[in-house]
């Protein structure tokens, strides 16, 4: 649940920060739409790849490195935006690549760790991270933006993913 929670706070924070980012850099709505959709360009590509990698190397490693990857690119988002519009698009595609393997990796873990009769409940529990992360991001991103600036929504949420990876990688076995 926590990885999915982090997935959604990292995914949603840009939609909350978008108006401020758009105003700061003078982007039009088309450019903003490209920023939003670039994430999904990477995301859709790794849906299939994530399943293949999880079957081959195990869901634990694939999920962990996916979180590490997308968290790293979440942290890079402000620097990318300040550098150039094009660089931000690249970073968002790369972030999507990391997030795209999340659910295939989870399903690989379910198949290996969770008895068949308990999988529906496990999936429901894990998927509860979607609305919880969404609510958290919609509430906390504006607070962080007011207190520290829009960039810190990306730094703080990305750092949470790095901390999660450290504990996951160290404590969870395949």
Q: Where are the predicted features?
A:
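Membrane-interface helix termini in secondary transporters
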Residues: 20, 51-52, 56, 143
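Cytoplasmic helix-loop-helix junction between adjacent transmembrane helices
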Residues: 91-131
